A protein has these predicted regions:
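Beta-lactam-recognizing serine transpeptidase/beta-lactamase-like catalytic domain environment
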Residues: 3-9, 51-87, 96-296
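Extracytoplasmic/periplasmic proteins that interact with beta-lactams or build/remodel peptidoglycan
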Residues: 1-50, 70-73
Length: 296
């Protein structure tokens, strides 16, 4: 009841003024994207969805929309899917394979491949196929990415070693936390190349048999657009202490994840996903803008 016990000690902690935190989020963008995301999740009856938009030059997260977002006055704990849930990236993972091959110089954007519908590989446990059946095609590496060909990506992946692909995954930050200022971040799930057995060796080339978060995926795409330099993403721009001093978060040192020339080539190849007549993202065209995409 608050009464002091005889012989007891009283400890008083003086109140301390709190500070102010300024986020990197763009309020208008966040609101619009949140509405669009909620509508798409409802339309497709998905379990959840997340959208991350990152400024590639600064690492500032302009949007982090999550389908389970609640009103700000609801203080109950809730999961942030964008940083806490990992998933297989699927065909977005083809960027890692193509990027690694460009980085090693085993291909160029115009390298030509004879791409079948199915590849029968002795150690794959069954054929590797494309999403849709087709006759054999002659495609450049750019065409392989534009059409999102599984078999074409495997042919590209076979020009480099498994260790080189794994090194590119790690260079993009897969398998480690991004360092964003949010608790409970998942590092994703990725096994070393020496643990890729049978079919896993091939399906990792197109984004299966490993898992990353939406934040990791956004960071990897930002790295490509930033000349191959990976920087720590931030959702906190600064904070002001009670004494008026302003501090900004410090991330880890930038990492040159891939050669700048290779990154530029890959970014241009991503534009073909939108611009090519057989590209998988023609609907993403925005008049007056160059748009680079990889569908998943």
């Amino acid at each position: 009841n608050g009464a002091v016990m005889p012989g007891g000690k009283r400890t008083t902690v003086e109140p301390k003024d709190g500070g102010n935190v300024e986020l990197t989020l763009h309020a208008d963008l966040q609101h619009q994207v949140q509405d669009l995301l909620d509508a798409r999740v409802a339309k497709h009856q998905a379990d959840w969805g997340a959208v991350v938009i990152e400024d590639v030059a600064t690492g500032h997260v302009l949007v982090m929309a999550d389908s389970n977002s609640k009103e700000p006055d609801n203080a109950k704990p809730q999961k942030v899917h964008a940083v806490q849930d990992a998933f297989e990236p699927g065909s977005v993972g083809k960027l890692v394979t193509v990027g690694a091959a460009l980085n090693q110089g085993t291909i160029t954007p115009t390298s030509v491949f004879q791409v079948p519908y199915a590849l029968n590989l002795s150690d794959a446990g069954g054929p590797i196929t494309d999403f849709h059946e087709h006759d054999g095609e002659t495609l450049t590496a750019t065409g392989v990415l534009a059409e999102s060909s599984n078999t074409g990506t495997v042919l590209i992946g076979q020009t480099i070693g498994d260790d080189q692909r794994y090194a590119m995954m790690r260079a993009f930050g897969f398998g480690e936390e991004t360092g964003i200022e949010l608790p409970g971040e998942s590092a994703g799930l990725i096994r070393g190349a020496d643990q890729w057995q049978g079919r896993d060796r091939y399906v990792t080339m197109f984004g299966q048999a490993y898992a990353i978060t939406a934040m990791q995926e956004a960071s990897a795409l930002a790295t490509i657009a930033n000349g191959g330099v990976r920087i720590t993403p931030h959702i906190v721009k600064s904070w002001t202490n009670a004494d008026g001093t302003v501090e900004v978060p410090q991330g880890s040192q930038p990492v040159q994840a891939m050669d700048a020339t290779a990154a530029s080539q890959l970014l241009t190849m991503m534009e073909s996903v939108v611009e090519d007549d057989r590209g998988t993202a023609g609907a993403a065209k925005v008049p007056g803008y160059r748009v680079g995409v990889k569908t998943g």
